């Protein structure tokens, strides 16, 4: 039976788990990307995404609710001033988990967890893909007339012989 399996306990007491998730969420908000295990990243994603959604509405009550979970004034101010402005039009999915392999010491699955809108590499790749698609379409239109010209010249050469 699945009793007491609603979320991953991570081998910790409730107080230790809530303190750890609070500290990890503050680090994620401040640094925009952290390295951790996959299990902790999944637990952190469930913890931090509702807080980011709450930060879209900048009211005294929402600040108090977020502060009760984070317990860090700097993280709360950064969340409400910078991050909430950048993700205002996004309907959810504010974090991304990227697996990086296993840790050498204990073979634990490691990953990055990052805020989606703060990764410059992903934004550059999207622009590059659009540029390559337009080039390909131009090459095919230019290549088609060039292929027709040699085909018409070859029969003329054969008829002359």
Swiss-Prot record:
Disulfide bonds: none annotated. It holds the Pfam family Ribosomal_L17. Keywords: Ribonucleoprotein, Ribosomal protein. Residues 142-152 have a biased composition (Low complexity). Part of the 50S ribosomal subunit. Contacts protein L32. Belongs to the bacterial ribosomal protein bL17 family. PANTHER family: LARGE RIBOSOMAL SUBUNIT PROTEIN BL17M, RIBOSOMAL PROTEIN L17. This is Large ribosomal subunit protein bL17.
């Amino acid at each position: 039976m699945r009793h007491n399996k609603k979320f991953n306990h991570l081998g910790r007491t409730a107080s230790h788990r809530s303190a750890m998730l609070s500290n990890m969420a503050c680090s994620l908000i401040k640094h925009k990307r952290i390295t951790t295990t996959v299990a902790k990243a999944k637990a952190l994603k469930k913890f931090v995404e509702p807080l980011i959604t709450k930060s879209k509405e900048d009211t005294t009550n929402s600040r108090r609710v977020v502060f009760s979970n984070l317990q860090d004034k700097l993280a709360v101010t950064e969340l409400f001033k910078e991050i909430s402005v950048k993700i205002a039009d996004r309907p959810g999915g504010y974090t991304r988990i990227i697996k990086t392999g296993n840790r050498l010491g204990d073979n634990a699955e490691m990953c990055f967890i990052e805020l989606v809108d703060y990764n410059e590499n992903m934004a550059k790749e999207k622009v590059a893909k659009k540029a390559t698609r337009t080039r390909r379409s131009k090459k095919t239109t230019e290549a088609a007339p060039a292929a027709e010209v040699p085909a018409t010249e070859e029969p003329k050469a054969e008829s002359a012989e």
